[in-house]
């Protein structure tokens, strides 16, 4: 009788151990599932990269929800900036945002130069209006600085030369989730052999051999949301107070009522 009790106790303990182990594996599966969901959510737009002719976006449909009014074809917003620590202990970033209205088939935006200081001084912000015609950036404001003018007129968005169709091959990401917002983040280590990394090094002054980290951020529903947004960051920072990164985003929302609201 005592043997049977001990045997029953042994079986109960083993069942409990397997149950706990099963829960652990369930959590891992759930975490892996979120990583895949984040990548699949990004793939909806990143599979279009490289978009060599931005005017192709006029004929590209995005995710639509109840925020769109009847007849509104929507608007694509493409954005790229390069940010780095400056000598003042703050941050400098420079880039462009362009709004491509599918209703009017027009594209307007601005090139921006921003300098943020560590303390004791307000940031400097300068915007230069641009438009795009025949896949060419046209500067609308007068710019005396010839180097800046050249950078604006020759600017290329990351999405015009990047190729992230192999995003599914990035694995073992560091995933964090805030269900209250909701927001989702995933980080993946990149290699300096990656063609996207080589492209960035050829276009920007990146004075480090450190391999970057690919950071993916989503605000809103993973399946899609016109009020949320997604952004990519390729982070070359060395850590500490050092900032060095390229930020990219391509989002689809209802067309703006006021095109000057930039």
Curated annotation (Swiss-Prot):
Which keywords does this Swiss-Prot/TrEMBL entry list?
Cell membrane, Lipoprotein, Membrane, Palmitate, Signal
**What is its subcellular localisation?**
Cell membrane
Similarity comment: Belongs to the staphylococcal tandem lipoprotein family.
GO cellular component term of the entry, any: plasma membrane
By what name is this protein known? Uncharacterized lipoprotein SAOUHSC_00402
Name the Pfam families on file. Answer: DUF576
Lipidated sites in chain (N-palmitoyl cysteine): 23
The record, for NCBIfam families, names: SA_tandem_lipo
- Tell me what topology the record assigns in the membrane: Lipid-anchor
Which residues are annotated with the lipid modification S-diacylglycerol cysteine? 23
Residues annotated as signal peptide: 1-22
Identify the domain of life.
Bacteria
Which PROSITE patterns does the protein's record reference? PROKAR_LIPOPROTEIN (PS51257)
Principal location: membrane
């Amino acid at each position: 009788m005592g043997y049977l009790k001990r045997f029953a106790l042994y079986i109960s303990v083993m069942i409990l151990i397997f149950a706990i182990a099963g829960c652990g594996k369930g959590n891992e599966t759930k975490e892996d599932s979120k990583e895949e969901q984040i990548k699949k959510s990004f793939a909806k737009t990143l599979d279009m990269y490289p978009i060599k002719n931005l005017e192709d976006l006029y004929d590209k449909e995005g995710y639509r929800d109840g925020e769109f009014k009847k007849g509104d074809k929507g608007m694509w917003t493409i954005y790229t900036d390069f940010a780095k620590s400056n000598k003042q202990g703050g941050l400098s970033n420079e880039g462009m945002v362009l709004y491509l209205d599918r209703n009017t088939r027009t594209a307007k935006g601005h090139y921006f130069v921003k300098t943020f200081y560590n303390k004791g001084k307000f940031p400097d912000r300068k915007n230069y209006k641009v438009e795009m015609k025949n896949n060419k950036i046209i500067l609308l404001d007068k710019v005396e600085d010839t180097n800046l003018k050249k950078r604006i007129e020759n600017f290329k968005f990351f999405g015009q030369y990047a190729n992230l169709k192999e995003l599914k091959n990035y694995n073992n990401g560091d995933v964090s989730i805030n269900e209250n917002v909701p927001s989702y983040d995933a980080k993946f280590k990149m290699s300096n052999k990656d063609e996207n990394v080589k492209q960035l090094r050829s276009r920007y002054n990146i004075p480090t051999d450190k391999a970057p980290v690919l950071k993916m951020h989503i605000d809103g529903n993973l399946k899609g949301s016109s009020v949320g947004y997604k952004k990519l960051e390729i982070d070359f920072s060395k850590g500490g107070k050092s900032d060095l990164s390229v930020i990219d985003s391509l989002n689809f929302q209802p067309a703006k009522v006021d095109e000057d609201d930039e």
